[in-house]
C-alpha cells in the first residue's frame, strides 16, 4: 500500500498505547535539558541531585541505586527533605525550544491513543502544552505523579499545577510523587493516581498495539507490571497483537523481560526511536500493522524527512498535513 493511500485514508482502530520510562527522557535529552541540567536516573540520582552529604550526615551509605536507599529510610524528616530536593530538581527541568522525541511521540499519535508515563520530569506535559493546537493529541497519564500537575478531587479534573478546575474553579491540589517502594498501593495513595491506574487498566485492555519506551520494569515496579499484564490479557489472549520495545538493552534480554506480554512472539525491538513504528508511520501506526496482518498488504513507510531535524515548526507543519485527513473521518 502506497504511503499516500495510508495517509489520506486513516482508519479508526483500537488505541495505540505508549508506556514511557526514564530511558525515554534520557533518549530525548541525552545532553541534558534546555539549561544542560542532567537527567537523573535511579542509579545516579543521589549524585546528580547532590544528596551525598545529606545522606552521610545521617550515616547512610550514599552509593548504590536510589530505589534501594529510599526503601531503607526510616527518619521522616530526612525522607521529607530528600523528597523536597527531588521535587525541586525535577521541577526545574525544561524542554529546549528545538524538537525532542517527546514532541515526535505526541504528534505521531492520535486522539484515540494514549501515553502513560512513570516519569516525574515535566517533559511529556510541557511537550503536550506546546503541541496541543497543532493536531489532535493522545490522552496522557502520569502513573507516579508529576512535578507539573495538580488535580481537583471534587471534580476529577487535573491540569497545570498552578491552575484552577474548569468546573468548580478551585485551585488544583498538589499530586504527590510516588517514590520507589515495592508496595505502592496505587489505588489508595490519592484520587488522581487511582484514576490514572484505572485508566491504564482500561486502555491496556483495549489496546490494538503497545510501545514500551525506556522502561526497565524494575523490582520496585512489579506491582505495576502485573497490573498492566492482567489488563493487556483481560479481553483477549493476544494471539495477533503486536508489542514494540524501544530500549538500548540487547534484544535477547528484552525478549526475556517482556515475554509474559507476548505469548505468540509478536514482538519487535529497536534501540532508536527513529526506527520505531511510531516514526515510520506517524499517526498511522495501527494501519501499518492491520493491513499486512489481515490482508497481506505491506505498507510503505513514510518517516518525516525534515530539512532541519531540530526545527519544531517544521515538525508541527508536517504532522498537521497528515492530520488534516483525519478530520474527514
Residue ranges and their predicted role:
Residues 1-20, 26-28, 199-329:
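SIR2/sirtuin-family catalytic core signature
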Residues 31-32, 128-129, 154-155, 224-225, ...:
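Short coil/turn segments at secondary-structure boundaries
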Residues 142-191:
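Cys/His-rich short segments
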Residues 131-142:
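A short alpha->loop->secondary-structure connector
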Residues 1-124, 133, 318:
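Gly/serine-rich nucleotide phosphate-binding loop at the start of the catalytic core
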